[in-house]
């Protein structure tokens, strides 16, 4: 009872803090206030430790790693987003993820704590097939890979938005120059060039970090799929069964393998590879969320305890 109450308290504290962090981040987009930025970062750190405490508490009183159903996996995914958020902060890197990870964490946790998954808030006894040492290895690797791949994909989507906006601005500016070619203002040209250079630098950094994060996520996804295959062989006598979850995991792996391949070709870097990563964003959600709710197979559990 004490552990359940503690888990309930930590859930609401983390959700409340992160709800305050998001509008704070939005304000920092308009006003560069150092104190405000620092407060929002500390808020995310507090959220990370609250979710960590929540998961540890659930682990203690349930007797198994909290990765057995949709609610627990969503909370772990929210924890993963928070982890990705705070790593650049401690390494003193410019945090390109802050505007992505904070909303991702609150949306994930918000759905997990909503009334739709009320039945899953109480921990259930694991079915025999899940009582394996591979549970933590396989599921944690898959969820960490989803978090990394989603963040990398969102960076690529941001890159595409900036790139296409720049092309529209250039097209509009070109038309303006053709109309007023005899009254061209040199100051406007300098400002226009500076903005383009700044956008170019930003897109380069976004491309670099999306590649790094997706590369990490792809590695974790590969480990997760391989460990799942070994576990499947122990539980069901077959490494691969082509059920919906396995099929979509393979599709996800293939899409991001194509992305990494395009990044090796300089002519396809930037917007071209970002388009592939953007497609991967949708594929991940189908693999993780859609199959769980709508699919049939060995991994399909929807709003109930995982049945294998």
UniProtKB/Swiss-Prot annotation:
Coiled coil: none
GO molecular function, one term: heme binding
Entry membrane topology: Multi-pass membrane protein
This protein's UniProt keywords: Chloroplast, Cytochrome c-type biogenesis, Membrane, Plastid, Thylakoid, Transmembrane, Transmembrane helix
GO biological process, one term: cytochrome complex assembly
InterPro entries per UniProt: Cyt_c_assembly, Cyt_c_biogenesis_CcsA, Cyt_c_biogenesis_CcsA/CcmC
Entry keyword Membrane: yes
Transmembrane segments: 17-37, 43-63, 70-90, 142-162, 213-233, 246-260, 274-294
Pfam families listed in its UniProt record: Cytochrom_C_asm (PF01578)
GO cellular component terms listed in the entry, alphabetical order: chloroplast thylakoid membrane; plasma membrane
Keyword Cell inner membrane: no
Localization annotation: Plastid, Chloroplast thylakoid membrane
Role played: Required during biogenesis of c-type cytochromes (cytochrome c6 and cytochrome f) at the step of heme attachment.
Family classification: Belongs to the CcmF/CycK/Ccl1/NrfE/CcsA family.
Subunit composition and interactions: May interact with Ccs1.
NCBIfam families according to UniProt: cytochr_II_ccsB (TIGR03144)
Alphabetical list of PANTHER family matching this protein: CYTOCHROME B_B6 PROTEIN-RELATED (PTHR30071:SF1), HEME EXPORTER PROTEIN C (PTHR30071)
Name of the protein: Cytochrome c biogenesis protein CcsA
The organism of origin for this protein: Nymphaea alba (White water-lily)
């Amino acid at each position: 009872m004490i552990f359940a109450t503690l888990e309930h308290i930590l859930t609401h504290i983390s959700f409340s803090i992160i709800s305050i962090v998001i509008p704070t981040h939005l304000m920092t987009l308009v006003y560069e206030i150092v104190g405000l930025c620092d407060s929002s970062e500390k808020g995310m750190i507090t959220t990370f430790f609250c979710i960590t405490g929540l998961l540890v508490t659930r682990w203690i009183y349930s007797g198994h790693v909290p990765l057995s159903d949709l609610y627990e996996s969503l909370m772990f995914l929210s924890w993963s987003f928070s982890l990705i958020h705070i790593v650049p902060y401690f390494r003193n890197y410019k945090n390109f993820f802050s505007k992505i990870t904070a909303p991702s964490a609150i949306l994930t946790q918000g759905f997990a704590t909503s009334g739709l998954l009320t039945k899953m808030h109480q921990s259930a006894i694991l079915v025999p097939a899940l009582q394996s040492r591979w549970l933590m290895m396989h599921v944690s690797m898959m969820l960490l890979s989803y978090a990394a791949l989603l963040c990398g994909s969102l960076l690529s989507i941001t890159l595409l938005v900036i790139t296409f906006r720049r092309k529209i601005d250039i097209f509009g500016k070109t038309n303006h120059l053709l109309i007023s070619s005899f009254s061209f203002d040199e100051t406007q040209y300098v400002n226009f060039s500076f903005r383009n250079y700044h956008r170019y630098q930003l897109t380069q950094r976004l491309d670099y970090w999306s590649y790094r994060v997706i590369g990490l996520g792809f590695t974790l996804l590969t480990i997760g799929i391989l460990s799942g295959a070994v576990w499947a062989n122990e539980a069901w006598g077959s490494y691969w069964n082509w059920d919906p979850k396995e099929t979509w995991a393979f599709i996800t792996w293939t899409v991001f393998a194509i992305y990494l391949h395009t990044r090796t070709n300089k002519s396809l870097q930037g917007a071209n590879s970002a388009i592939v990563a953007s497609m991967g964003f949708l594929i991940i959600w189908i693999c993780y969320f859609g199959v769980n709710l709508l699919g049939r197979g060995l991994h399909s559990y929807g709003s109930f305890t995982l049945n294998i």
